[in-house]
């Protein structure tokens, strides 16, 4: 591993020395591709020894969503977690064998949300220092990441944590690059750009792909893409996770400073100690998770509004709903009756491909 780390340090130093302009874009693109390949070696080392990157530090996924809390020691992360779990927890004592710092599962708006403390994100975690690599491997499985920062020194910590997560293939609050990429057997590199490109040209694209030993491929750039965007698509192992920056200890700043923080995107100011602004934080968590609640209505009975079936926003068809209840239900499915925003008439008869919306009511009719 030390050889890989030395190569990474070498490339990073060369990138820092290189001025960024049109003339150096090609060279920088090449360096970035080499860096990404070396980082991948760290994430998934060659050879079988020592288990996977998350070995000994994983926990069964329970509930409808998983939130990872990341932050430096002494920023108030533990206080926030225990107070959140204490106030909103459905189960106060939640048992995990390998991860003792998990306070539990909270229930909010009918959904069960698992809270995970991810300790040890320190500078150099992505380079294999401490337990940082195992922690970030678990972070990759989260539906939402909360970066907890001390309001008195937020920017330095924010940058370090973001760099660690980025280096492990986690992209915060961003969408996958709009790039079409398809390898083929022959025909060379065929590059199509549907809009003007400020950074990538044919030569840079070819050299980045050559670094991956790819000499035949169709590449379509549908937005103004960077070398990093292309590398992310070629690597194919990136995860795109929403993130909220929780600025703690607001009892130590002025009202004027608080007003400024409120205008920063993706930020929620709180005081974990005094439990200030927890409602705002939970509402933002709910918005970012984009969960969809579906209520069930047994035939001849009133809908059950106490325990919704909770679906991720990307999988909300009637078939997805059936699979969440029981995989055999779809085999017996005839049609469904739906009440709510997803239909024009209440109730409306729909098939398994119908897309449901939050707080719809559904009744399944079997064959």
Curated annotation (Swiss-Prot):
Q: Summarize what the UniProt record says about post-translational modification.
A: Polyubiquitinated; this modification induces proteolytic degradation and is impaired by interaction with ZC3H15.
Chain residues that bind GTP:
71-78, 96-100, 117-120, 248-251, 271-273
Q: Which positions bear (3S)-3-hydroxylysine?
A: 22
Q: Which Gene Ontology molecular function entries are recorded, alphabetically?
A: GTP binding; GTPase activity; identical protein binding; microtubule binding; potassium ion binding
Query: By what name is this protein known?
Result: Developmentally-regulated GTP-binding protein 1
CDD domains noted in UniProt: DRG, TGS_DRG1
Positions carrying N-acetylserine are 2
| Domain OBG-type G intervals | 65-290
> What organism does this protein naturally occur in?
Mus musculus
The record's EC number reads 3.6.5.-
Kindly state the tissue distribution recorded for this protein: Fairly high levels in liver, heart, kidney, testis and brain. Very low levels in lung, spleen, and skeletal muscle.
Protein's cellular compartments: Nucleus; Cytoplasm
TGS domain: from which residue to which, for each copy? Answer: 290-366
Which of the seven top EC classes does this enzyme belong to? hydrolase
Q: Per the similarity annotation, which family is this?
A: Belongs to the TRAFAC class OBG-HflX-like GTPase superfamily. OBG GTPase family.
Source domain of life? Eukaryota
Report the NCBIfam families cross-referenced here: small_GTP (TIGR00231)
Domain comment quoted from the record: Its C-terminal domain interacts with TAL1. The ThrRS, GTPase, SpoT (TGS) domain is not necessary for GTP binding nor for the GTPase activity. It appears to play a regulatory role favoring GTP hydrolysis mediated by DFRP1/ZC3H15.
Coiled-coil residues? none
| UniProt keyword annotations, A-Z | Acetylation, Cytoplasm, GTP-binding, Hydrolase, Hydroxylation, Magnesium, Metal-binding, Nucleotide-binding, Nucleus, Phosphoprotein, Ubl conjugation
Q: Which residues bind Mg(2+)?
A: 78, 98
The record's function comment reads: Catalyzes the conversion of GTP to GDP through hydrolysis of the gamma-phosphate bond in GTP. Appears to have an intrinsic GTPase activity that is stimulated by ZC3H15/DFRP1 binding likely by increasing the affinity for the potassium ions. Binds to microtubules and promotes microtubule polymerization and bundling that are required for mitotic spindle assembly during prophase to anaphase transition. GTPase activity is not necessary for these microtubule-related functions.
**What Gene Ontology terms describe where this protein resides (cellular component)?**
cytosol; nuclear body
Subunit and partners: Interacts (via its C-terminal) with TAL1. Interacts with DFRP1/ZC3H15; this interaction prevents DRG1 poly-ubiquitination and degradation by proteasome. DRG1-DFRP1/ZC3H15 complex co-sediments with polysomes. Interacts with STK16. Interacts with JMJD7.
The reactions it catalyses are: GTP + H2O = GDP + phosphate + H(+)
- At what positions is Phosphothreonine found? 100
């Amino acid at each position: 591993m030390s050889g890989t780390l030395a190569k990474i340090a070498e490339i990073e130093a060369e990138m820092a020395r290189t001025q960024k302009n049109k003339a150096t874009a090609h060279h920088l693109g090449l360096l970035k591709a080499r860096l990404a390949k070396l980082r991948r070696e760290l994430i998934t080392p060659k050879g079988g020894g020592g288990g996977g990157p998350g070995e000994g530090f994983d926990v069964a996924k329970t509930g409808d969503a998983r939130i990872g809390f990341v932050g430096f020691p002494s920023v108030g992360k533990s206080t926030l977690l225990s107070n959140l779990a204490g106030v909103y927890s459905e189960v106060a004592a939640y048992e995990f064998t390998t991860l003792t710092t998990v306070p539990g599962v909270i229930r909010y708006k009918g959904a069960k949300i698992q809270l995970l403390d991810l300790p040890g994100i320190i500078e150099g975690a992505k380079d294999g220092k401490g337990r940082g690599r195992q922690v970030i491997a678990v972070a990759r499985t989260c539906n939402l990441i909360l970066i907890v920062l001390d309001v008195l020194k937020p920017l330095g910590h924010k940058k370090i944590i973001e760099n660690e997560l980025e280096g492990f293939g986690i992209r915060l609050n961003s969408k996958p690059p709009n790039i079409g990429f398809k390898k083929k057997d022959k025909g060379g590199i065929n590059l199509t750009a549907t809009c003007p490109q400020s950074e990538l040209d044919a030569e840079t694209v070819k050299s980045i792909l050559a670094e991956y030993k790819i000499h035949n491929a169709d590449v379509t750039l549908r937005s103004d893409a960077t070398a990093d965007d292309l590398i992310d698509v070629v690597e194919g192992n990136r995860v795109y996770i929403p993130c909220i920056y929780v600025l703690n200890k607001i009892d130590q700043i002025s009202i004027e400073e608080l007003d400024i923080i409120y205008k920063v995107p993706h930020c929620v100011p709180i005081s974990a100690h005094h439990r200030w602004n927890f409602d705002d934080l939970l509402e933002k968590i709910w918005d970012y998770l984009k969960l969809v609640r579906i209520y069930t209505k047994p035939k001849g009975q009133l809908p059950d509004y106490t325990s919704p079936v909770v679906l991720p926003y990307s999988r909300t068809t009637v078939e997805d709903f059936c699979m969440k209840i029981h995989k055999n239900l779809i085999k017996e499915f005839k049609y469904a009756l739906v009440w709510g925003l997803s239909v024009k008439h209440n109730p409306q008869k729909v098939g398994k491909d119908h897309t449901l919306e939050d707080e719809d009511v559904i009744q399944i009719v079997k064959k």
